[in-house]
Amino acid sequence: MFSNRLYSPLRYPGGKAPFAPFIAKIMETNGVTGGHYLEPYAGGAGVALDLLFHGHASHIHINDADPAVYAFWVAVTKHSTELLDLLESTPITIEEWFRWRTILREDCVASLVEKGFATLFMNRTNRSGILKAGVIGGKSQNGNYKLDARFKKDVVASRIREIARRQSDISVYREDSLRLLNR
């Protein structure tokens, strides 16, 4: 009843995605298969994406109060071409890590797509995918793993493209989860 199918471009070790088959079964049991599904604390939105891609939900609503995560999901669903261009053109280096960390952490002038890409870059190059964690391999890059160890651009790009194809079936929010649930 658990899944290891991964559809999210973000990495969240220990995330909710493996529970998608269980949620699908609950939806089926309650006669709501094919309806809308809300993931109030989206993060990587693994459950929502799995349900959408396997036809258990016709529309998913992903919500995350974190402005960085929200920017990422808006970039994927509304500006995927720009996001993919950044993904393709940005080298995975420690210099770029510092650049994107600055964009993510500081109140600097950056577009929503740049903020979204900074989220992706940090998620893929930081320990355990934690946005505020340190870089994989350390700043001197002398660890057993290097910062690109979890950043397979081709896999990430493929996932972004698949999600972008379903953009009309995905709504993205940055709201308080309880208020959103009470709408």
Please annotate each region the language model reported.
Residues 33-95:
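Conserved S-adenosyl-L-methionine
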